[in-house]
Amino acid sequence: MLKNYVYLNPGLTIDFNGEKFTSQGIVSQFYQKDQGFYVNTEGPDGEYHDYKVIYTFGVTPLQQYIVQFPNGHYQCLRTAWDSVKNRWFDLYPDFKVVHSEWLHWSRGGLNWNNMCADCHSTNVRKNYDEKTHSYKTEYSIINVNCEACHGPGKQHVDDVTRLGNRYTNSGTFQMTFETEPKELVDQCARCHMRREQYSTHFNFEGTMFDHYFPQILNDQLYHPDGQILD
């Protein structure tokens, strides 16, 4: 399950002193209690509840905050902290979302397990149980490290140690100078495009299409140079 995530950093200028932030008619109040960080905001039932903020990811230019829900669900608040301008802001300021919609922060659209972890952690196993609508998400490393792009490193290190200058890639080391452009796109695009994942987890086997369904290029989703339009 989710663990060893970066805790709220007291060295950053973050206001959890009772401030209220309002966007699209929703008021979120951030405060501290019993050495914990909390937010009072609208929940999945349309009522206001107190939620304990237990994890954060990102440092600059922004931080997002995570709340733990039942059954292993981790939800990302829609309100984030601008650590450059020292202010709260809405990730989608012009977009009204009703509490019953999938895009509400407490539902699927901002669910860390399914929407964030695959590209922001290494070797993620979502471990979703459809019958109980629960997660037992696991990962090797909480952030993106070398193995997220280059694959498991143990065999590579063992081979280099054993062979020295005689080392040749046995196929366990991904994304090298020998990687063909099409293969490189397969391995990079999974986190640098708009797509949906339909495999249980990414394991460097097969092609990108064995794991993901990409969105077709159009001017509503991408900039002319190919960057994602956010």
Regions found by a protein language model. Give the residues of each.
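A short, surface-exposed interaction/processing loop segment used at functional sites
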Residues: Q75-G109
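Short, flexible loop/turn elements at secondary-structure junctions
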Residues: W81-S83, H120, H192
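Primarily the internal scaffold of c-type cytochrome electron-transfer domains
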Residues: M1-T56, Q64-F69, D90-W102, N123-D230
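C-terminal substrate/ligand-recognition segments
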Residues: N111-K126
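N-terminal accessory interaction module
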Residues: T56-S83
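A common structural microfeature
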Residues: V27, G36, L62, Y74-C76, ...
